[in-house]
């Protein structure tokens, strides 16, 4: 029988909230007896925007903004039913996006 993996991908603008959420998921999974790989930090995606400061003239006067998106990946290897139930009941902080995929073992 093929083993199952749960791959969890976390995204957030604030890296502290992201790390706290990842730590909470790892603690929950380990408490229920599952093996956890990660969190693995992926490269930070930086989007930069340059806008004119004034609405009319002064092309040379500009302002720059950036958005940093931090990403982490966790793999839960061969989860138990208790692990899945505990992860479903887990309440993560706001501002952290979570994407869960169920896949076969590699």
Curated annotation (Swiss-Prot):
Example GO BP: translation
Alphabetically ordered keywords of this record: Ribonucleoprotein, Ribosomal protein
GO cellular component: ribonucleoprotein complex; ribosome
GO molecular function, one term: structural constituent of ribosome
Classification via Pfam families: Ribosomal_S10
UniProt keyword Nuclease, yes or no: no
Family assignment from sequence similarity: Belongs to the universal ribosomal protein uS10 family.
Oligomeric form and interacting partners: Part of the 30S ribosomal subunit.
Job description of the protein: Involved in the binding of tRNA to the ribosomes.
UniProt name for this protein: Small ribosomal subunit protein uS10
Xref: PANTHER family: 30S RIBOSOMAL PROTEIN S10 FAMILY MEMBER (PTHR11700)
InterPro entries assigned: Ribosomal_uS10, Ribosomal_uS10_CS, Ribosomal_uS10_dom, Ribosomal_uS10_dom_sf
